[in-house]
């Protein structure tokens, strides 16, 4: 779509939006460019219908008007963004056409942007300013993206909420009393609020998928090691730490934009595997929705899932079935979900041990001694993971390899698995100590950390998982679906999401 004169007039006047307003009138959002896709904006930039500086100024005006309420963009580099936009406009005028040239974006605070602070919400790191970019940020900049700033996260990126002592609390644009999710919560909130069209997040326990589900946007948890994890955090490693669970992934408001950003980010690190390997991802398995073989999972043996979430999932599966998709609700090759969850939880907890205070480890060791061997609860798996020996870690890793083989075997018969991203919709802010929190899931009191059960499937075995919005709860809160595919078949899950989006719709703006 072209940017007509009235649209240009809006952008020119964007700075006049009342910063002091609690929330601008809905009409302002509807009349703005803020909810266009990255693809549309890039076409407008390439054709000369809009300048990068105009897009940057419009985004800054919207952030300044709304973010005192939402608190998503907690590190700002507006002067740097304006300078980068001017440089991008000069390049566009010369005919340069990098894939993201002139597009304003934000990135999660944990990713290093040279000269900007990276604390991960930890007060002792609040003044730390890395001098080099995270490799993923370097790739975004090389593609021409203009970085406006960085978005909020929980302390250490270890929560399904986004608050910390350094930057405060990020609110969900759909309901300010609720969390946008975590750990990429500021990223999802920035997208939902219309600040930017692309974001960069990461995931080890649902950190891309939870916020996308809670805020009604799109995210893609990539296949393990698809995007190198080098240069992140206040104490970055000099070469990439080979992935065990955590991944980097794109976030957007459309499936096509996920594919666009992934094309920029994916590929081996030139310092390590890139010396000898190039990435060639397979194309999507199918071009038509009705050709996909779909397995739907709406129940987990270790944790309930809210009826509103399963209802939206089953509503989607019924629509797909009516279209002619081959829908299954069970499969003889489906790996044991309980074993998958317990193995994941132990390895996830083990990944945190090196960064825990010694007193916490001592408490966990004391608690582990009280566990019965028969206690196979999810909470017990956490304690065992936090006190795991190296020998037991190897045993759990062997179990993971066996589960990975079974999941990959399943994808010989199935193209995608659909399941909830999380057991609930966005919940009210809860800043009490994390290990004492609980969730109310349709009247059932559930330990807070159990909510990672659905997210853990794809993380444990390194599979791609795309999350997209598919409906609303009775309270009007977004509900998403998680689309899991075979290893390195990232294009298939994104393509399936794009087909669903085309057929049934996708992102809708919150009532700001």
Go through each PLM region and give its residues:
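Residue-level signal for inorganic ion chemistry
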Residues: 59, 81, 258, 294, ...
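Acyltransferase
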Residues: 54-57, 86-89, 307-332, 356-368, ...
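N-terminal secretory signal peptides and thylakoid transit peptides that target proteins
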Residues: 1-17
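A short helix-breaking turn/cap at a secondary-structure junction
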Residues: 27-31, 221-317, 362, 495, ...
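Short glycine/serine-rich loop segments
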Residues: 132-265, 459-480
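Short helix-loop capping/hinge segments that flank enzyme active sites or metal/cofactor-binding pockets
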Residues: 95, 100-120, 286-298, 328, ...
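Gly/Ser-rich catalytic/binding loops embedded in alpha/beta enzyme cores
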Residues: 29-205, 318, 323, 405, ...
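Glycine-rich, small-residue loops and helix-cap segments
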Residues: 48, 102, 142, 146, ...
